[in-house]
């Protein structure tokens, strides 16, 4: 009876050593033979993406002349053709968020902040 235990232990140790001695050929390693180009992510800024952004920018001088000429925020929204888009997006948070990411809406909000700062004084 004890001889059967010896055979079981011998068979188990044989199986364990057979698993440890087998090599895995499915592993692929990086080839480090020579220099290679690394593909890194590059994050572009708005200035890099848009070459003519300065020409379209709403700077303080333009806002000052618009304000002195009597341009209201609603009038500027109409000039940018945003009134219908704002009215359509008023009931949807997703639509308003998407509209807020546009260049025209950012210009309108910049002018709105300028007018709010200068009328409060």
Curated annotation (Swiss-Prot):
Secreted effector involved in P.mirabilis colonization of host plants. May perturb the signaling of cell death associated with plant immunity, via interaction with a host MAP kinase. Pfam families: WYL_3. Residues 1-18 form the signal peptide. A motif (RxLR-dEER) lies at residues 38-56. The keyword Cell membrane does not apply. Belongs to the RxLR effector family. GO terms for cellular component: extracellular region; host cell cytoplasm; host cell nucleus. This is RxLR effector protein PexRD2. It comes from Phytophthora mirabilis. The RxLR-dEER motif acts to carry the protein into the host cell cytoplasm through binding to cell surface phosphatidylinositol-3-phosphate. InterPro entries: PexRD2_WYL. Keywords: Host cytoplasm, Host nucleus, Secreted, Signal. Residues 57-121 are annotated as: WY domain. It is found in: Secreted; Host cytoplasm; Host nucleus.
